[in-house]
């Protein structure tokens, strides 16, 4: 390596300076003390003392002085006349980084010297990094990561995760690693903010380390495109060779076509408007490759070169044969002016008079390959030097320039090939040849003495000896009296002195002191990644002659880690062994990732280079803030004294180099030696002295036999293992079912040898042949589809194959065409077998297809059929959903049954309407011992409705709070339930942040790029829920503060709150004053959040409004009253609470031993019911608020409150659906809060064990026992007789919650719904051939119900069997005014409409055929009010090309 000795003074220079106050009484005695300018605690450091020509015994003392006291490092007498000695010490641990003073005292009988200088003492930083199990994640996946620390004595760390909006979504406090490693994980929500995320590790020092990963929706690619192009071409080239190769992740070539697009333009512009492009198309060959020779003469590279820097951008897109799947690759080509160029391998930044100046260059072509046997010329005008030589086989040319005759301070060198380029203007068309320039500056020495360290280029390998040549020339009048000259050297790395030594040169009388010698330097691990060497000698007159050099050291690790698989190629689902070799007792983190993930998002491979580039691994030399590099008053020669009263200081000028300026070693030095050359100065006005600002803490840096395949992970291995004392550990594991290549790696930490990293190990999961099934996601009973099984043979020989679809009573299957179950499959061939399948059963139907290679006496073509030794049979199982025709209906019958000594019974009749779809009826009976059992089991599935907006998401969040509180209070919380509930809370927290605005508010669909408006009601709901969730999960306090601040700004002088944003549930708009109802809700939320500052004014608003509310007749304001009752209960205003409850009691509906409340003008039901319909959302919500008002009484609810609440709880339980929720979101949240409080208030730990029997009028009977051990268990049985009569009996003592669920389908029939719904397809008929493969669905929707407008409306469009929606055409609907959100699933399209009036709204999108299906049945479109689910309309549509075409 050649030395880059920069001429300018940098902050990392050695500080060799006098302090003005230093006393020097030694005469000819010389001294130098060297110490690192930055010291690290808990790290051995050295201080080196050099005394020269002492004439008496002295005592040398070195001390570190800080605010904590004085610590002596060195205190010894020195008798020797000359001494060079280094002392080791370990700096103590300061509380924080601090500057300390290094005090040097040298004292003898006649002489005394003292000097003090500032050094920095700081804690040794642990080097920390983060590794994730893969670089990108899908929504809902678990993010696994490990924190790795190089410091075995690691202090507590804090990790947090930030999403793209910098929201803190997860946090771990005081994490302690085990042997330097800690693995953590967290789950992403189903709908997280997509984009880049950061894991931030905050170390004790305040320094942050960050690791990024990406969250996005993606489908793993099955193949990747590799584009091979030259790195560069010259302007004289006319052809570019572009090769595109494509292989599956399991290594086999892809068949298909490739399109290459080559664009020429300025690389700084991304837009193609700045580029000219060419396209070439070709077929991939049998190796999956295509090479194209592209003519580029039309781009006129020579003419354009000097106008703009040029480059070519190459994009290759491969289209897979058969599937049409596309994937791309990219390449870039730089355009250079010459066909070749020079690389300087050796050329110092400074020259020394009398010592040869060595130059080494390499001539390379445009690809970077060396060019041998070419003539190279050199010119050095100041030295009067010209020469020529021929490059060797490595393209190298070497020169040695005599510097003796140089009279100036610079040396300009020009190296060129063939001939000099004399024409450099843009108009020149002559070919330019390679040339390179270098300038070196003189090193200053008063005596013209110099030393130069010469070392070869390259990276030094660890654990070897490196030889450095030292060239010197020494002059001076006193040299003749010296018998010998001693050269001293130091080697530093990582800011510490590692090695010292010396070399003695004998001086011959009368001979010039000139020559060279070799120094052998052991290359140690502690020198990685860079070492610095300083050599110096002291002349008798005190002049220091020195040089320094840097060594690049191989980035090696002591802990040698090796990872391998045995065998390295395995069948899916077979056993393999992962073998790890490392230092004994190493803790190793293992990882293996599907190559498909890395194709989609390549990541930097964990390597020694990456580790040594981490913060904390770099040298950071230190210059004290108060120290000016030119402190001495006599440092420069003045041109002329100035007669002025102004203070002046001197500014050095010149580019000569001296010891002071070129020793880039990170040392602080104390010396009375001559180390600087005089510099010429001029004077400038000097500013008055300024005090340094107070010292601040450092700012934190922000700176991868038969097989049945069904297991397809993206990350296969993510484990920690400890290596045994032998240094080898083997882990047996099962290969996943994915046919791919797995990329694996290991990182290990050892207390003895530190960090080690393995190179990438690969395992090919492959079998010689396999089968893939093609089938639709779901069909409707009566439809038929073609099941295709494609078998691929990648063996070099032919196989006799049998393919079999396992028979089942759930479907019939007929082979298509002349397909046979046995056939011959040639080498590298594929074959598809097909069956026409008609499902007969409803529900999930399994299809199992097996292919097997068999022995056969018959030849396959001209070959004998072979049988592979392994992987002879492959079986794939896929599930098809078979649905009944018509519209799904569900009825739930729930009861809270409490028995004492006498048996309690209840009868139930399951009736079916006359036009029920055949075989679609099914029913089950459930028994639970706890009132919340069903909700606990189904907390993420409480209602069968979409969750796509900010308010609906909260039904996935808030109930978990009530469940955890309830189970905690009743001491029923298990680790399993707790883990799930906390996971749901964290996921809901992440999702809700999607709907936050920059001002701290929340709305149903977020800020829409700053266009949306915050919603007052939803913000209060989120604030309350986040505040309550703090007891269970991490909630960033800023989210609560931001919401509270925004709500405070919405409060009026009256104490009421103004409404902001849309209220999608217009029951909130139903009172005499919307603000009263809203204010009651917000007041309640603030009281539940323990945020009182604005509550007193809000309560005043409610009290002032009560008289108006109370005078309302016929229950006009019952919803508002229920909210106010709970708000005053929370505020502790018992008088007002009781007054409101008394008013509510007059308006209660009391029947069948139950109590509830209704609105006076609730919407009419839209259809005739066999059964009493489930109550609407508002009725459930207001009744639940009354229960909360009664049960939150202080200090405890009275017996009367409990008794009245029991009646309402009985009514509420009858409104529950089969999943434990209610009809919509807000009623589910409030009612579950009420049920949990009632359950806690009435919970009994008694050993009562009631039994429940359900019995039909026939022979069916099932008995359930409920006790303490299964209280939370949901026990269930299917009911066989539908229609039928059943009796439910409860005996023993205690309460049970019984629920019967009946489901069936009805054909679509004419009705009078609350919505007018029309559905049509375009084209209408099959005349257009495109209608068979894709067509447009158009919807027309208007509201015909009893209100002026609906609440939020959901339009649910089910897909025809075998069809999928064209996602971009659906997403485009979000641009329309009334469409707030769209969702696309495998089988449905959902449109969220903010509201619908009597004005018709129109929407359309395109669906396309994915898999052909025969006898297509119509698909259903359902439109319904989200909060009044009885307001619903249905329609159906058919494919234009289906038989019995019908659009309703």
From Swiss-Prot:
Keywords from the named record: Bait region, Disulfide bond, Glycoprotein, Protease inhibitor, Secreted, Serine protease inhibitor, Signal, Thioester bond
Main location: secreted
Covalent S-S links between cysteines: 48-86, 245-277, 263-289, 462-556, 588-748, 636-681, 824-860, 898-1295, 1056-1101, 1326-1441
InterPro entries per record: A-macroglobulin_rcpt-bd, A-macroglobulin_rcpt-bd_sf, A2M/Complement_sys, A2M_N_BRD, A2M_TED, Alpha-macroglob_thiol-ester_cl, Alpha-macroglobulin_TED, Ig-like_fold
Cellular compartments annotated: Secreted
Glycosites: 55, 295, 315, 387, 502, 751, 846, 968, 1114, 1285, 1398
GO cellular component: extracellular space
Location of the region described as Bait region in the Swiss-Prot/TrEMBL record: 678-709
Signal peptide: 1-24
Cross-link (Isoglutamyl cysteine thioester (Cys-Gln)): 949-952
Molecular-function annotations in GO: endopeptidase inhibitor activity; protease binding; serine-type endopeptidase inhibitor activity
Subunit structure: Monomer.
Family: Belongs to the protease inhibitor I39 (alpha-2-macroglobulin) family.
The protein's role, per its UniProt record: A proteinase activates the inhibitor by specific proteolysis in the bait region, which, by an unknown mechanism leads to reaction at the cysteinyl-glutamyl internal thiol ester site and to a conformational change, whereby the proteinase is trapped and/or covalently bound to the inhibitor.
Protein name: Murinoglobulin-2
The species this protein was found in: Rattus norvegicus
Gene name in the database record: Mug2
